[in-house]
Amino acid sequence: MKLIRISQALRSLKKLSDEIRYADCFGEKQFTSGLIAFRPTKKSNPKQINHADKDVVCHVIKGSGRLRIDGKRFPLRPGTICHIPKGTPHDFAAGKSEDLILFFSLIKTH
């Protein structure tokens, strides 16, 4: 068993790019969970990510932004939870004024 405070995980975010920071919180054979933070940018990276063998579940912790799937944009705000099936290309972007912070789980599916 492991307990993590979100405030503690936020302090341990590591830079992935100018736009993205992340922190792994939990990891097992079938799943990984953590925090990911997107900074506001004038133009977000249009590259989409695809997890071929993992479903994604995200919970918006702080900030606002959007999720893009198949050219459709879905607004994200604190309290929003989303499920992205494996193999679905997607990307996230923060709104204009503050970071978009998500708690995510990548769940290996067969």
Please annotate each region the language model reported.
Residues 14-48:
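A short glycine-rich, His/Asp/Glu-containing loop-to-beta-strand
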Residues 38, 50-67:
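Short, conserved beta-strand element in jelly-roll/cupin
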Residues 86-110:
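Ligand-binding loop in jelly-roll beta-barrel domains
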Residues 71-86:
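Short acidic-glycine-tyrosine-enriched beta hairpin
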Residues 57, 64-66, 73, 89, ...:
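Structural motif
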Residues 49-51, 83, 90:
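Histidine-centered active-site/metal-ligand motif
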Residues 27-29, 68-72:
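Short strand-coil-strand connectors
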Residues 28, 52-53, 60, 85, ...:
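A short, compositionally biased micro-patch
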